[in-house]
């Protein structure tokens, strides 16, 4: 009787956990993000960080030249003393993923808060990659637990977690490649324009960060076309989405 009661109790607990699996996944992902952000202050300045920030400022200076009126002048003043990216030796180095950091930096105002904000911003990009991996595995397996396990494996890798706070090249391109794959799968499965647009945008940022990001854009595009041919679904709408 006791053994039967114990089995029933364990079964009830497992069923209760399964029913709350999505909530548990959300809580775990939030805790992962919170822990990562909480320890950001423990990471120092990366070797290339000053150069990357200089490239970002040069990009902003370049854009200010094409914005008319007071807004363009205001942006140009903020980037005073910085050469335009078109005149820089670093003009082939992209940093599109960090355009949003320009607004975050204004809130931070001064050092050391700007460096801290830069590292937190970088970690947020890493977490977007973790979420994208969760989404990819969920699409492929339809399992919350397998998706969460895959996300934790990436997150708990010491190298990935650590560099997720300051590596603004390799970690960023990895994150946006994962995002590209996720939206590419969503586009292929659901055939909606919004996923095609998000897929293209994520691929553009990945490619801007490192040219290797273009490979995944091309591979997914070719895979989508092959799928349409195999399923004999080469309609105008499906082709236009791709």
Question: What is the predicted function of each stretch?
Answer:
Residues 150-155, 162, 182, 203, ...:
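Short helix- or helix-capping micro-motifs
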Residues 40-47, 65-99:
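Membrane-proximal lumenal/periplasmic loop motifs of glycosylation machinery
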Residues 172-189, 195-203:
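Specific aromatic-rich, kink-prone transmembrane helix
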Residues 6-10, 183-192, 216-242:
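Perimembrane helix-loop-helix junctions
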Residues 133-156, 189-194, 198:
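Transmembrane-helix signature of polytopic, membrane-embedded enzymes
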